[in-house]
Amino acid sequence: LAKNVAQLHNLPVCIFSLEMSKEQLTYRLLSMEVGIEAGRLRTGRLQQEEWPLLGQGINTLGQLPMYIDDKPNSGVLEMRSLCRRLMAEQGKELGLVVIDYLQLMEGSSPDNRVQEISRITRGLKGMARELNVPVIALSQLSRGVESRTNKRPMLSDLRESGSIEQDADLVLMIYRDEYYNPETPDRGITEVIVT
């Protein structure tokens, strides 16, 4: 999604990767771009005909206005500041901000984590409004999903979710039946649940 916004609309995209390093995320993006497994890219075990594809993919991604910040424990204020700086450098509004993932963000007070997440989601909503940019904040699910017969996620499954559903304009949840049932006839199908 982030790559498409940068590529198709030529708008700067800011990705805050709190879980993965910049290098890991770049390998994933490159893997998607060229259709070669990320592990093979990392090890360099490519077929002769794949090397030119790799070069083209690196060139394509290198031209995109994408910024990846992989500093752990970032907070809303740091993210807002970085987004403003990126907008000033690029001379235009951002096309998208992606945060991977919400529960790894640092709060500004020692309150309980649910209250902290509530402050963070309100801050992200304010940042989106102030900078006029869509913000996609990925979130973890609680382990409760695993104990149910029907594993499709619900709003109540969002970890520390007190305010996520309240502050979000839209919550999308992803479900792949083959993850839980390898023999399912729905192999290769991903459901997007809109709540």
Please name every model-derived segment.
Residues 85, 93-137:
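Helical hairpin unit composed of two closely spaced alpha helices linked by a short loop
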Residues 21-25, 37, 46, 50-57, ...:
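Helical mechanochemical/support elements of P-loop NTPase systems and associated helical scaffolds
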Residues 8-13, 63, 94, 99-102, ...:
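Active-site lining segments that contact anionic ligands and/or coordinate catalytic metals
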Residues 116-195:
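Phosphate-binding/switch region of NTP-binding enzymes
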Residues 18, 46, 101-102, 140-141, ...:
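Short, ordered loop/turn segments at secondary-structure junctions
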Residues 4-93, 107:
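Cytosolic-facing regulatory segments adjacent to core modules
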